[in-house]
């Protein structure tokens, strides 16, 4: 059983308490995960805040280079990360319709590379004899990321890479059900980034609540349930924290009269049961035109 640690200011940090992470296929204990305290969250946020002034003025080209390097480093550990993802989350390597751990790993690398190529150009909203008005998008500061268990690595990358690319520093808290792949990924990423730019703390929902209330976190990014998103919104309002909430969807499919039902049915089935149906984008409603309803 591997040892896992928090990563704060580029260093591995042990905790007094741990919690068990289970293999959902066998319900056996897969690992003991560090349980961060409120004080350790404060340390992680303080490290991110110390790193922010330097990281925020790092050349745009250098941040882009580092994101490409991160993708390469994660790719070099792709087999290890994919196996760990299967063990803690339960999805097989290939998965239903080919959308298993291997797909998530591939998406992780692609997202790193794609984000590296994004830019934040100056937007000119007025340029005439009266005035020239430009919009410059500047880094916010410390971003808190709270991620779910259904796509633990991919969604972590969705949160973290745009934040880093735009000059912010990050404290991430993965789901307590699937923290191991994210812990290992952050460890790998920290071999490339300056200390404090990316920190990770692990624990239960109380740690996420503390992040939402933390006065030195400038923005919260959360993917998860609508009830939890409502709580985060309420907490963040207390200190005018910016938020991005990706909550549960209610996706629909529409089958029109001229549809080739035999061809469409397997795709509809796959869309409903991708990742065992445990995804915000899974098909939940199906509308079929009355002319082909019986078919």
Q: Model segments located where?
A:
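N-terminal Rossmann-like NAD(P)+-binding subdomain of aldehyde/semialdehyde dehydrogenases
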Residues: 1-131
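Residue-level signal for inorganic ion chemistry
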Residues: 27, 63, 85, 167, ...
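Conserved small-residue-rich beta-alpha loop and adjacent elements
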Residues: 124-194
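A structured beta-alpha segment of the ubiquitous adenosine-cofactor-binding alpha/beta core
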Residues: 132-133, 200-218
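Periplasmic-binding protein-like
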Residues: 161, 219-223
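Short beta->alpha connector loops at strand-helix junctions that form conserved
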Residues: 168, 173-175, 202, 223, ...
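Active-site pre-lysine segment of PLP-dependent enzymes
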Residues: 182-191, 205-214, 227-238, 254-258
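ALDH superfamily catalytic-core signature
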Residues: 227-295
């Amino acid at each position: 059983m591997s040892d896992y640690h928090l990563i704060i200011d580029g260093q591995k940090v042990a905790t007094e308490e741990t919690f068990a992470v289970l293999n959902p296929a066998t319900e056996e204990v897969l690992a003991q995960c560090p349980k961060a305290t409120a004080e350790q969250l404060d340390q992680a946020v303080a490290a991110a805040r110390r790193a922010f002034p330097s990281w925020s003025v790092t050349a745009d080209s250098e941040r882009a280079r580092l994101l490409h390097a991160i993708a390469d480093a994660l790719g070099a550990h792709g087999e290890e990360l994919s196996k760990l993802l299967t063990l803690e989350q339960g999805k097989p390597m290939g998965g239903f319709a080919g959308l298993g751990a291997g797909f998530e790993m591939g998406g992780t690398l692609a997202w790193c590379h794609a984000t590296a190529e994004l830019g934040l150009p100056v937007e000119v909203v007025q340029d005439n004899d009266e005035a020239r008005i430009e919009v410059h998008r500047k880094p916010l500061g410390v971003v808190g990321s709270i991620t779910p268990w259904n796509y633990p690595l991919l969604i972590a990358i969705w949160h973290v890479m745009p934040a880093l690319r735009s000059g912010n520093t990050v404290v991430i808290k993965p789901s307590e059900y699937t923290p191991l792949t994210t812990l290992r990924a952050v460890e790998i990423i920290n071999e490339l980034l300056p200390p404090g730019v990316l920190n990770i703390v692990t624990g239960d929902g109380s740690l996420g609540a503390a992040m939402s209330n933390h006065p030195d976190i400038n923005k919260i990014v959360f993917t998860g349930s609508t009830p939890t998103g409502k709580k985060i919104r309420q907490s963040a309002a207390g200190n005018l924290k910016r938020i991005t909430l990706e909550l549960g969807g209610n996706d629909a499919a529409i089958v029109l009269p001229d549809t080739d039902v035999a061809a469409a049915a397997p795709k509809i089935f796959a869309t409903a049961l991708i990742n065992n149906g445990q995804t915000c984008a899974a098909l939940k409603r199906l509308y079929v035109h009355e002319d082909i309803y019986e078919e």
